[in-house]
């Protein structure tokens, strides 16, 4: 019984993201983020994610963050993530540690995150709104490399390129078949 009942699909998802950090003092800050995720790149809803957190800069190379996210997921694609083809809400608590270092002109970061996900589900097809929110635990690890496209370091308004790989692993009682949840690989341009 080494087989897995996982279904793989390919979707054209557009992710549009706002991220802001507001420094409150030398050590504390506020992280804000909104992700507008669309199916068929932009034409249909896929997901809305609002995340806020409190940052604590332990030292120049170690950032700690704890926070909350509110996620609304809509049915999309050939096989909706929710078996009833309905939207659902997720309430998520998270804790994060990010370690940073520099080698030459390359900025490296390693992000370790724990998430406690309370994912809405319907106990039966007859209920109109999610009535159960079981706890799903997830660990995330991301490595990111960032290189300035001009100059020797990334400052405000410096163009840069970044590469990242993030692995998601579920654990605990309600995980079922999705222990290895996701692997996100990306290339970013920014300034």
Language model feature labels by segment:
Residues 3-67, 71-74:
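Start-of-domain marker
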Residues 4-6, 36-40, 80-84, 126-133, ...:
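Extracellular loop and loop/strand-boundary signature of outer-membrane beta-barrel proteins
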Residues 10-14, 46-48, 89-93, 133-141, ...:
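Residues that define the transmembrane beta-barrel architecture of outer-membrane proteins
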Residues 18-22, 52-56, 95-101, 114, ...:
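Residues on the lipid-exposed face of transmembrane beta-strands in outer-membrane beta-barrel proteins
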Residues 26-27, 61, 102-109, 149-159:
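Short loop/turn motifs that connect adjacent beta-strands in outer-membrane beta-barrel proteins
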Residues 30-32, 64-66, 106-112, 139, ...:
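Transmembrane beta-strands of outer-membrane beta-barrel proteins
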Residues 34-40, 68-74, 101-103, 114-118, ...:
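Transmembrane beta-strands of outer-membrane beta-barrel pores
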Residues 81-139:
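Hydrophobic, well-structured mid-protein blocks that either form specific transmembrane helices
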């Amino acid at each position: 019984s080494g087989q897995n009942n996982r279904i793989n699909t390919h979707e054209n998802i557009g992710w549009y993201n706002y991220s802001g950090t507001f420094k409150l003092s030398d050590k504390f800050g506020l992280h804000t983020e909104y992700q507008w995720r669309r199916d068929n790149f932009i034409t249909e809803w896929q997901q809305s994610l609002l995340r806020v957190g409190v940052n604590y800069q332990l030292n120049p190379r170690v950032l700690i963050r704890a926070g909350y996210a509110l996620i609304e997921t809509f049915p999309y694609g050939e096989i909706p993530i929710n078996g009833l083809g309905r939207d659902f809400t997720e309430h998520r608590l998270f804790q994060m540690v990010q370690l940073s270092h520099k080698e030459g002109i390359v900025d490296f970061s390693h992000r370790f995150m724990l998430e406690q996900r309370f994912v809405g589900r319907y106990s039966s097809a007859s209920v109109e709104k999610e009535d159960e929110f079981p706890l799903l635990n997830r660990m995330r690890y991301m490595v990111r490399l960032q290189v300035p496209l001009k100059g020797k370091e990334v400052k405000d308004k410096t163009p840069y390129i970044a590469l990242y790989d993030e692995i998601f692993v579920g654990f605990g009682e309600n995980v079922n078949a999705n222990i290895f949840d996701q692997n996100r690989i990306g290339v970013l341009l920014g300034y």
